[in-house]
Design a protein with these regions (language model features):
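The AdoMet/dcAdoMet-binding core of the Class I SAM-like
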Residues: 2-42, 46, 81, 124, ...
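Acidic/Gly/His-enriched mid-domain segments of enzyme catalytic cores or analogous surface patches
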Residues: 160, 164-242, 310-402, 626, ...
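Polyanion-binding loop/helix "lid" in catalytic or ligand-binding cores
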Residues: 387, 437-498
Length: 676
């Protein structure tokens, strides 16, 4: 039998060694783990494989007894009794949890190698482990892929301490990019995974290694799937609208440089309630009371709901517009709101900038060209984008310092098979196009049931627990609001309709609750129109026409210079790719030269501009598969010259696409008289 299994002192020494190595990388987390070790029972087992609770606590000179993870000694002992450690057939240590094998009962190391040496893992930039196991998978990853990001997610510190007692984690802790998420909530985990790149991560999630926290890992897997869906949607949106955004920005550039930003409102109204007006069917419930609500809360209206609000004679304090499409601009066609402030972004359809209102202000551009131009004028604050204009409206309320936000019309579903509020552009359009053989109700039913993303998900329910009809797109929006509610717990958000899709983190309120608030009309007007409140943030006073023109000239001159420099640099790289190579030295020289040029491209101030009309990774891979021969195996399995030739060929393809992107920018800038 493996002598470590019944040698308490050796296990104690191994735990101490692992904790010391852990402290070198994660000192704060190690202190928390060491406190857990004070309560940690024995990891030693007897020959039957049962836990033997006679292990002393590891040395701890701190004298602290707090438990940062919120567990207690009884919890640990109960969890330990479900984890059995025993000897594998090859003499290594293995384990089971609730009779599920964490590792092979024959050869744990070989099993880990087979799991990790797959194309899926080899091509990933990061390897993510759900659960610590005993450490065989992590050790194999450290040995075989030391240059990858290694991320270990373990919600229960007990299981990591148990692994530290019976397996040497030194190799894992020596990996340059190694991350341990121990006891972290799912939102924190998602944030870290997004930082390292979820799309390029290989997730290793054996059922046995996640059984001790099944609900946690199930929730995390759902969040990862939603996040990947969001990335897919973003890629497709960029592919579809990238050129439109670029065209709109070039048309709006001169006008936008003379506009102020939302900066003045930052944290200016923590004492005021906000009400977000979206265009869902439940907006009809609040419209009769909207005039009174305006006296008690700051109204932030989406462009889709504006027509309905004006129909009842109420001009909201703020109007949000984010979508760049022409059809979206039609929501505001023939409307005017001289008492309202319009908040938008430089890439919207140009007609938006001709809307008649009190003032148009901007938030920071979502796109590289807009952010580049902003460097030469007033710095503008950003707003989050969750795929829906309502998400930007919510984030604007949070940006203003709101502690309570009410939402009306944020249904994210089809209550009573309705699609939009009465009086909205969508609803009016169905009346306009309906006829005797296809009435309004048939159009609404078609909008619901022929939606490609339609799903009758029984888990989707309103605030009273009744099932609702929704689709995958709106569920993704709901997840965005859920994640923001978790990220900003001090901001309370309420739905004014029980018929809306229930968003975890939101609570249900009645319009009477809002109407029972005191009238604060003067305070609201002072904040919105900056007469008194928020005066400390009024640094964005309008620039003179002369200053605006100077800023515009400086921005365009710098943009032209930087684009031309990048264009010449990329052309030089493409020429280097065309050199003929015969020997390994020739290939090495070309690759070194390309590395030097890549450094210059990376340092360019306009390198990000190419991303707007650059193919997303999935499409780029598809282009490469169609344009290039199959990738040869890398050395030492393959020939160096063959692999180098393929890399040079692929680099040339990428440089060609970058040049096309630069040419597209120059084309639209010239078309609008912004490029000499």
């Amino acid at each position: 039998m493996n002598s470590l299994l019944n040698d308490v002192q050796r296990q104690k020494a191994l735990l101490e060694k692992n904790l010391k190595n852990f402290a070198e990388r994660f000192p704060a987390l190690e202190r928390s783990l060491r406190l857990q070790a004070e309560l940690f029972p024995c990891a030693a087992v007897n020959r039957s494989g049962e836990i033997d609770n006679r292990f002393d606590a590891v040395d701890n000179d701190s004298g602290e007894t707090d438990n940062d993870f919120g567990a207690n000694d009884n919890d640990f002992r109960e969890a330990d009794n479900r984890l059995k450690i025993f000897e594998a057939k090859n003499g290594e240590i293995t384990a089971s949890y609730k009779d599920l094998l964490l590792h092979s009962r024959y050869n744990p190391s070989s099993e880990a190698a087979k799991t990790l040496h797959t194309e899926f893992v080899t091509q990933a930039d990061s390897i993510v482990f759900f659960g610590s196991g005993l450490g065989y998978g992590q050790a194999e990853a450290a040995q075989s892929f030391p240059s990858k990001n290694l991320i270990v997610i373990e919600p229960d510190p007990l299981h990591l301490l148990q692994a530290f007692c019976v397996f040497d984690w030194e190799a894992v802790l020596k990996v340059p990019s190694c991350v341990f998420l121990v006891g972290a909530d799912t939102q924190t985990v998602i944030s870290v995974l997004e930082h390292y790149g979820l799309r390029d991560a290989a997730v290793i999630a054996p059922k046995a290694c996640t059984a001790h926290a099944q609900a946690y890992f199930s929730a995390l897997a759902s969040l990862i799937a939603r996040n990947k869906d969001k990335q897919d949607i973003n890629e497709k949106t960029l592919q579809k609208f990238g050129t439109l955004w670029l065209s709109n920005m070039c048309k709006n550039l001169a006008r936008s440089m003379s506009l102020n930003g939302i900066n003045r409102y930052k944290d200016g109204a923590p004492h005021l309630p906000f009400c977000i007006l979206a265009a869902g069917p439940s907006l009809d419930e609040i419209l009769p009371h909207l005039r009174e609500v305006k006296k008690r809360a700051v109204l932030v209206c989406t462009d889709t709901a504006l027509r309905s609000c004006l129909r009842v004679g109420v001009q909201p304090h703020f109007i949000l517009v984010t979508d760049p499409q022409y059809l979206n601009a039609r929501h505001m066609a023939d409307l005017k709101a001289p008492e309202s402030i319009l908040i938008t972004e430089t890439a919207v359809y140009p007609d938006v900038f001709r809307f008649k209102c009190r003032e148009i202000i901007l938030y920071s551009s979502l796109f590289p060209l807009g952010r580049y131009i902003e460097q030469f004028g007033e710095k503008k604050e950003p707003l989050a984008a969750g795929g829906s204009v309502a998400s930007s409206a919510w984030d604007f309320a949070r940006f203003c310092g709101a502690k309570i936000i009410y939402t009306a019309g944020l249904d994210l579903s089809y209550p009573a098979n309705k699609t939009h509020a009465r009086g909205s552009t969508f609803e009016e359009k169905t009346h306009f196009i309906s006829h005797r053989l296809k009435g309004t109700e048939m159009h609404n039913a078609a909008a619901v049931y022929t939606n490609p993303a339609y799903t009758n998900d029984n888990k989707a329910a309103d605030y009273e627990g009744n099932p609702v009809i929704t689709d995958a797109r709106m569920l993704l929006y709901a997840w965005w609001f859920e994640s923001k509610a978790a990220s900003f717990p001090d901001v309370k958000t309420a739905s004014l309709s029980a018929k809306s899709l229930c968003i975890p983190g939101f609570f249900l309120a009645n319009v009477c609750d809002l109407l029972s608030l005191p009238v604060r009309e003067k305070e609201i007007d002072d904040f919105c129109f900056f007469q008194t409140a928020g005066a400390e943030n009024l640094t964005d006073t309008p620039s003179s026409p002369r200053q605006n023109e100077d800023n515009k000239t400086d921005a365009l001159n710098s943009l032209q210079k930087d684009l031309c420099e990048l264009q010449n640099t990329v052309k030089q790289a493409a020429e280097v790719c065309g050199r003929r190579c015969r020997t390994e030295a020739d290939y090495t020289q070309v690759l070194n030269e390309l590395s030097r040029i890549d450094e210059l491209i990376y340092k360019s101030r306009v390198k990000a501009l190419a991303s707007l009309v650059f193919p997303p990774p999935s499409q780029l891979e598809s282009i490469a598969q169609k344009s290039l021969p199959p990738a040869p195996p890398p050395p030492p399995r393959g020939d160096y010259k063959t692999a180098a030739a393929y890399n040079i060929l692929k680099s040339k393809l990428i440089y060609t696409i970058i040049l096309q992107s630069i040419d597209t920018h120059i084309h639209y800038l010239k078309k609008n008289g912004l490029f000499l």
